[in-house]
Amino acid sequence: MTNRRGVGAALLGAALLAATASCAPGEEGGGRTPPPLPAASDAAGATASASVSATASVAASVAAGATPGGGETNPTPAAPRTLVTGLTVPWAIAFLPGGDALVTERESARLLRVTPRGQVHEVAVIEGVSASGEGGLLGVAVSPRYAADHFVFVYFTAGNDNRIVRYRYDGRLSDRRVLVSGIPKGAIHNGGRLAFGPDGYLYASTGETGERGMAQDKKSLGGKILRMTADGRPAPGNPFGTLVWTYGHRNVQGMAWDDRGHMYATEFGQNTYDEINLIEKGHNYGWPEVEGVGGRPGYTDPLLTWSTAEASPSGLAYARGSLWAAALRGERLWRVPVDGSGRAGRPAALYTGEYGRLRAVAVAPDGTLWVGTSNRDGRGSPRDGDDRILVVRPSS
């Protein structure tokens, strides 16, 4: 992979890992380098092995909460408020003009409309969804020209594939049209995130379904980020003349853009590193040849990595100068400041263990974050009222 920060950055990241082995909620979680971040643990009195004595000053700056610019750490947001309870594996959130949101439920195949006051209305049960394993009704996106075209888009697992379907929505769904079919499906790694970029085109993430080879096969739709028009055609400027925008992905679960148009994506690693990647046209992100930072020509290294216990990063949003990544296995919301060049500052872990598995995160028109839990997906420990949507007011 192409190492954006160089060997010195890698050594710094390794030093941080050795010197700092715990991270309480809201505490800084690592450097601005691509190597692994310090392990995060909320256990009181957790200590580090401190096998690299030369890192004392680096560890001290992390503990003091210094930002890349030398200032103070961003304040921790206030505790979330619960907007909605009683959902079943809410997978994606996309906002309509006016502030209501469309929310997908993976298992039930229900498309819901949720108001800012917490009212829930069933729009429809999406036809043709085959929910099993990690498949089901996954992503949803609203056209940036919704006022004119009333288009909404869903990504779901069908009987033989994953597919992207467009509807017209004006209080009810109509004019169903399959835009993309034949996306590989499996019990795992179905991708499924949909989002419109600032260029007005629809992006979709796909997984490699556990079949590693398809991630490097540019002719396969699996293990990719796709870019298309609202009619499902390859968008102008795509690097290979197909739907494929980037390849070498294992299972991208979140996509977001910052104020300057930089694109970021969260990705599940296997057993070692989860990632946030800076997404660039035509790049190869390495899977299965590389997991995490490889420094190998031809592969693009991640912007940040975590241990899989800290993250399993899913939904991703950008607000107030930071990326906000929902973590499933890590049971926390990560805040990652990014600068105008797409470089990342030190991540902070928020609400660790307080709400269980977090999957969806989206920015509402009023600037708040809506965060969906995923405690009823068979891998969590449901609490009374789960699953729920939380509202977070992000700090600057």
Residue locations for each model-derived region?
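C-terminal motif of bacterial Sec signal peptides marking the signal peptidase cleavage site
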Residues: 19-22
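Segments of small-molecule ligand-sensing domains
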Residues: 359
